[in-house]
Amino acid sequence: MRKQMGAVGILLWGMAAGRAHAHGVVGQRSFIEPFITEDVNPKNEFVIARPEWDHARDGRTLSFGFGLEKKISDRFSLTLDSSWLDITPKPAAEPHASGFDNLGVTLKYAFFIDPVHEAIASIALESTAPTGTEKVGAEQNASFKPFLLYGKGLNELPDALEYLRPLGVQGDAGFEIAIDRARTTALAHNVAIEYSIPYLQQAVHDFGLAWPLSNFIGDTEFNFEHGVNGEEQGRSKVFVTPGFVYMDRWVELGVAGRFPLNQAANDELDWGVIFIVDLFIDDILPWTRWQPIGGMRPPTPPAGVTGS
């Protein structure tokens, strides 16, 4: 064995290629939990921390996001998430504010899974309850967002482009609709482009890369928001979020930058940094594999392995 995995990983990479990854699996592909884009895969996970530091011309915002997703059946999941925010405005004379954001509840169903073509599609409905602190910007009216999610690996590229096969795409698109008609309805679309070193090693060519590089996945996300009506009607914001994650069978750790790509986005953000700590709880706590529909489930097979 090349190197001990340390406290984060007890798994033995050399024992079986692909054994390290068993979450978000479609065929030989393991999709990550993106930074901004919604994960297309229903799964059991606990995002214990999603810290984000945003710097803008009108102040600085520090947020700590968290969320729990639980599978109800093999293709259906329920997510609860929120965040704590600390806002330091400019000028300093303006009041400092901190508190919790609203509670989000998301139902997700994967209606299409094609392991051979590494393709998956889901539908989801996210609703937001007005439970947060108004002084940090938490809306005091409920809202909801129906959206479509998709994921696709580039495993079908010809041999001449085999080193592009580790590329994969995840995305989501949907309308953020407020119950309060005075608020803006927005069309949001996020795209995550991933390059998987584990996939390169296992499905294309084994370069013998050592841990932890062998578990790295590059991720660049493009985040779009377009106002459909209200104060933001006709106004589009575009951001880019480049970063990378480390992912093994138990945890995903990642860091990314966040930058505006047009003037409307720059009015909201100069730059930001976002982190993620995501625990795959069904391998850490096997009893969490129990599902209301289907009962206790076996461990998710590693990428590239057919399981029940």
Place the predicted regions along the sequence by residue:
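Bacterial N-terminal signal peptides that target proteins for export
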Residues: 1-7
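Terminal low-complexity, poorly structured segments
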Residues: 7-8, 76
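Cleavable N-terminal signal peptides
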Residues: 8-9, 20
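Transmembrane beta-barrel domains of Gram-negative outer membranes and organellar outer membranes
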Residues: 22-308
